[in-house]
Amino acid sequence: MSLTYYYAPQSTASVTTLVLEELGIPCERVKLDIRKGETKKPEFLKINPNGCVPTIVDEGVAIWESVAITMYLGEKFGEKAKLWPAAGPKRGEAMKWLVWTHVTLGEAVYRWARNTMWAPEDQRNANAAATATKDIGKLLRLLDDALRERPFLTGEYTLADAHVNSFVDWLRHMKIDMDGLELLGAWSKRCSERPAYARAMERENG
């Protein structure tokens, strides 16, 4: 078994857990306890000097950052499984949504979280939080509109849908307002009804 997956349940690794379930590929799973500092131990820092999950090691090469992992697994395993577009514009579209989620939407979410729950109360900026909330709403409407004429982000379900929906799930858990985003809600429901999603949730909660 050449693929090793380092993860922690209920963390930023959740999306990779879902991607692996969708692909159904065998791997060695190494569970790390973030609260106990296991991601900061020297033996793990040799694999990922950032000290964070998710991280995979395939054929002796360490790959970190969830977007990079999804793209890599998609290219290596996903095309054959019909979960990743062949090289061409559709693959570019899938990659676009992955990067948009973590860069454009992610930046607004970071500003919101920084000023609502991550920073000490005396270091939070209510105006910045309000602006971030508006920006998140605008971006989610953009995503909703992109689903107006197609059931999934590139037309057919791919790992991009799994990945982006995992992020949307987290926003919903954080009580981000999604009222009125009916297309987004229906898309998320379709993604969440897949068997791989149920298996991933079992791993997350097990």
Locate each region found by the language model.
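A local structural micro-motif
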Residues: 28-30, 155, 179, 199
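GST-like domain detector, emphasizing the conserved glutathione-binding G-site
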Residues: 1-127, 144
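Short, flexible loop/turn segments with low-complexity composition
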Residues: 86, 156, 199-206
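GST-like fold's C-terminal all-alpha helical module
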Residues: 98-193
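Phosphate-coordinating loops and pocket residues in cytosolic domains that bind phosphorylated ligands
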Residues: 46, 193, 202
